[in-house]
Amino acid sequence: KWRSMRSNGVPETYITGDKPAYDKFDKWDESLQYAMRNPLYHWTHLELSRIFGIDKVLNPSTAREIYDECTAKLQTPEFRAQAIMERMNVEVVCTTDDPIDDLKYHTQIRQSSLKTKVLPAWRPDKAMAIENVDTYNEYLTKLEAAADMSILNFKNLIDALQKRHDFFASQGCRLSDHGILTFYAEPYTDAEIEAIFLKACL
């Protein structure tokens, strides 16, 4: 949905920004009119019909009514996330989690009566984001705490990530989700990788 909105020139403040919820919804319904024959168009109406029992077509003239009806239903116990998942027979949901995440909510969910499995997925993007040295070093400090070890070189980084990966696996993680924007095709030696890492850690 966000990609579709961006493609239609919707300002980011209406997508991930701080605009009011209805204003964001309204921008979505405006963008949806350009998604005819795109799965997004059909998925949106399937969601409205199957989950909310709303069979109206979402467009600028119906947006407010549909928004208000959905909002009212979402305030009821029958429309809590867990209730919807059970009603829709959802067997597994995977969340996107950083290696430093403690996954405490996954433990709570496992101990609850929810039949749907909620499993973590490994997303280590920040462990590779060396472009901003200050932000990267702040992240390494958090990773050190999560892995309970010092990160003084590249091997330490890999070892810390392995420890966290093992922990994630113990919590049911079987998937990874990577947001790598650029794949660097140049071959690097171990010494070059170490030098780059240490330069980022200065």
Language-model region placement:
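Metal-cofactor-binding active-site regions of metalloenzymes
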Residues: 1-202
